[in-house]
Amino acid sequence: MRQNKRELIQAVFHNEKADRIPVGFWHHFLQDEVGADAFSHPQLTEKALEGQADFYQAFEPDMIKIMTDGFFGYPHPLLQKAVDSPKELMAITPLGRESEWFAAQIRYARKLVSIYGKETPLFYNLFAVPRTIEFMQAGIGHPVNLSDWLKQEPNKLAHVLDVISDDYAELSKALVEEAKVDGIYLSVNNISCDEVTEEAYRTIIAPYEQKILEAANRVGGENILHICGYHGFHNHLSWYREYPFLAVNWAAKVEGVSLSEGKKLFQGKAVIGGFGQTEKDLIYSGTEEAIKAETRRLLDEAGRIGVVLGADCTIPRDTPVSHLKWVREAANE
């Protein structure tokens, strides 16, 4: 009997033989996924749910990344105004389990699990705390350079990250334990590829990202690390080799690091991706012949164990679903 989607992803994430190659693509559903505030405007959650439903019906993905459009923020009063230094955040305290920030996300995840979870594994998107701070400050017209914070006030920044990541760790645990998602999909990046040293990142940033993954691991989460290369952002991938995840997705096209190279870099962990994610890339603009040829090339290069075919990051909203189906067809000829 052929593996169902749950058995398929379980096998791939553990580098076991699978009946076929799974395919996982995703895109945003709200027009302003970063600035949208579903905590204050819960109707946005319904729009996101409708978007997930339409995409699932059209494509029937082998795994679902729960898109958290509207939930990018951390609605703490201290972060909802312009901040110029981490010392302005030293009084920050966790929002806690009783907050709407916490409860709304559990409700949202539970709803999706109740609809799709019986047959398809779901992974809840969370952003690491530095990315959340950047999103929130940019959203009020006050972009911040966290690499400056890291250089000028490292201990104060560490304190802020520690406090907020406590909330994210508790949320990740509850998403797995209570909402019954299969794992979290944690999005990280280097903050600044050129301005931040590896030592500073490992000391000040990494512990509070790893904390989130570790919390989900403790309750059985099968977790994914996403090293975000959106808009061509470059990362030092090796900085994440020791993070506690089962599968990893990075911007293979942007970084110039193939799936097989990434598999070696990340010590044999399962890999997700292969295709670029912009309107200039093949998955959006390619012909059936070209997309199928690239699918075969990716698998010839990466092998068929521990591989999920997908993209560097979210694909454009209007990517033809037929293009995604061509990948699945070619992968399983």
Where are these regions (language model features)?
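Active-site-proximal, glycine-rich beta->alpha crossover segments in alpha/beta enzymes
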Residues: 76-174, 202
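Active-site mouth loops of central-metabolism enzymes
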Residues: 35-47, 146-170, 223-227, 279-290
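N-terminal small/glycine-rich loop or linker at the start of catalytic domains
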Residues: 14-40, 70-71, 76-78, 123-156, ...
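Alpha/beta enzyme core
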Residues: 169-184, 210, 300-301
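Short, acidic/polar
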Residues: 43-55, 164-174, 233-239, 289-298
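Catalytic-face loop-and-helix region of soluble metabolic enzyme cores
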Residues: 8-18, 32-35, 210, 214-333
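Glycine-rich, proline-tolerant flexible connector loops at the mouths of alpha/beta enzymes
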Residues: 63-86, 90-98, 182-199, 312-319
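N-terminal basic, low-complexity leaders that serve as flexible interaction/assembly modules and, when applicable
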Residues: 1-80, 107-114, 202, 206, ...
